[in-house]
């Protein structure tokens, strides 16, 4: 086959995509096969057959929170305005001065598709005292890696502010909460978090940034098992075949690959109150040494587009049809290029998020995903060619016009526009049982405290 610059680029882009959906498992042994089977069963159990019910419940809670905000503001006046919780998740816990004494109350607060997530509730408190990550096979007690591999439910907190540079990706086990409230904890300059074939995980109040691809090697993934891992991608949080996951009040930026990926039939996920920034650089991958025609010898790097969020990694992974994800009260801020998220196959409810900057587009997809966009604010960039919120890939209009992409109550600013598709009478938008979201004009308030919080124990947060 004679390579041209064009088909060479496409070839290596395909290679990149294939590599990105591998599990990074060097030896797919009986332990991993069993975990994968259990994960598929958990995903089927977590899938909600009527996602409209979940969307309605969240929208109803937002409405109640806003209708009660006036009385709450009067109450807060007595506290000199030191606490203002502007959405229902935050109102559930933030203004309680005793939140640190009852950390597990946080599990009562989750909304959306991840609403049944309880993390380490009912388990012991594990205090991380050591920010080192030197031994990947026998992690040191008191480190984050030692905490997340324990077999029992754990509520993981931190003794002090710390920066944790993970030597390789952090492979978690089920029934864990990583709760950094009250501390400034950064996962930075090393590996990211890997949730692979697990369930019931809460990640709260972390800073995750400057995550790098790992080299792989022998890594312990449970108390009783370790094995060889291949090179990791450099995602901040990778959700791979996992269910009942809640990511809340996390600040993320500048990871080598994606900020958050959810793939391989991951479902029952809520991402809320997060702040995403500075993820628009382009990575280049060096082409292996091959004999090319003369005209392609100078082409030694290929472009790898970065994604803020990738939900579904392959057009061939039809198992991602089970994917259901809620994005609520997040701020997609400065320095983001595209893919907020980029969706294949599954269902995404994006509600009351603030999209204040993008360079190419905000929401994209392929393989007929279902997208319900409600009450978001979209502020388009100055570039006249990047005003469209949406982008469909690898399908002509004759095909994508049947995909269900709906916008309701979104606020479009600076020329932004959302191209809808699908039946205009789709059940999402019709019927007496439909509860509308609060419109996009409420977003600046609902997302006001997105990102990691500066909480102090003994005081409202």
Tell me the role of every PLM-derived stretch:
Residues 5-23:
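Cleavable N-terminal signal peptides of Sec/SRP-targeted secreted and luminal proteins
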Residues 27-97, 298, 342-461:
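Extracellular beta-rich repeat passengers
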Residues 107-156:
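Acidic Gly/Asp/Thr-rich repetitive segments characteristic of extracellular carbohydrate-active
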Residues 132-133, 161-162, 183-184:
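Acidic glycine-/aspartate-rich tracts in secreted/extracellular proteins
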Residues 140-152, 163-177, 187-204, 210-242:
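Extracellular beta-strand-rich solenoid/capping regions of secreted or surface-exposed proteins
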Residues 175, 180-183, 199-210, 225-226, ...:
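Right-handed parallel beta-helix
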């Amino acid at each position: 086959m004679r390579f041209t610059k064009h088909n060479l680029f496409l070839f290596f882009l395909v290679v990149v995509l294939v590599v990105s959906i591998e599990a990074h498992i060097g030896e797919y042994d009986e332990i991993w096969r069993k975990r994968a089977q259990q994960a598929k069963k958990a995903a089927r159990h977590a899938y909600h057959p009527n996602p409209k019910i979940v969307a309605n419940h969240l929208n109803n809670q937002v409405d109640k929170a806003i209708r009660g905000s006036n009385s709450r503001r009067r109450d807060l006046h007595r506290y000199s305005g030191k606490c203002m919780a502007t959405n229902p998740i935050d109102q559930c816990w933030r203004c309680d001065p005793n939140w640190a004494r009852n950390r597990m109350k946080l599990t009562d607060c989750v909304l959306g598709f991840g609403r049944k997530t309880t993390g380490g509730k009912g388990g012991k408190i594990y205090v991380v005292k050591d920010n080192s990550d030197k031994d990947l096979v026998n992690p040191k007690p008191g480190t984050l890696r030692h905490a997340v591999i324990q077999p029992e439910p754990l509520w993981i907190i931190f003794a002090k502010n710390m920066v944790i540079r993970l030597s390789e990706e952090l492979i978690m086990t089920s029934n864990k909460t990583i709760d950094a409230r009250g501390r400034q904890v950064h996962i930075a300059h090393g590996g990211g978090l890997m949730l692979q074939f697990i369930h019931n995980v809460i990640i709260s109040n972390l800073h995750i940034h400057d995550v790098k691809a790992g080299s792989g090697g022998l890594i312990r993934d449970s108390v009783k098992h370790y094995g060889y891992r291949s090179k990791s991608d450099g995602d901040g949080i990778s959700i791979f075949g996992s269910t009942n996951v809640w990511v809340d009040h996390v600040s993320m930026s500048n990871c080598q690959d994606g900020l958050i990926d959810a793939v391989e039939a991951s479902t029952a996920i809520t991402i809320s109150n997060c702040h995403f920034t500075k993820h628009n650089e382009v990575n280049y991958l060096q082409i292996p040494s091959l004999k090319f025609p003369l005209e392609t010898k100078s082409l030694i790097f290929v472009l790898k587009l970065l994604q803020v969020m990738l939900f579904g990694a392959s057009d061939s992974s039809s198992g991602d049809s089970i994917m259901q994800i809620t994005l609520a009260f997040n701020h997609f801020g400065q320095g983001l290029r595209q893919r907020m998220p980029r969706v294949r196959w599954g269902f995404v409810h994006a509600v009351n998020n603030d999209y204040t900057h993008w360079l190419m587009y905000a929401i994209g997809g392929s393989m007929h995903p279902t997208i319900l966009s409600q009450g978001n604010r979209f502020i388009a960039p100055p570039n006249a060619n990047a005003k469209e919120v949406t982008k469909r890939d690898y399908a002509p209009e004759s095909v994508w016009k049947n995909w269900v992409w709906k916008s309701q109550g979104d606020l479009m600013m600076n020329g932004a526009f959302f191209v809808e598709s699908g039946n205009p009478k789709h059940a999402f938008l019709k019927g007496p049982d439909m509860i509308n979201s609060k419109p996009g004009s409420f977003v600046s308030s609902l997302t006001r405290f997105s990102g990691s919080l500066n909480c102090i124990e003994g005081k409202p947060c």
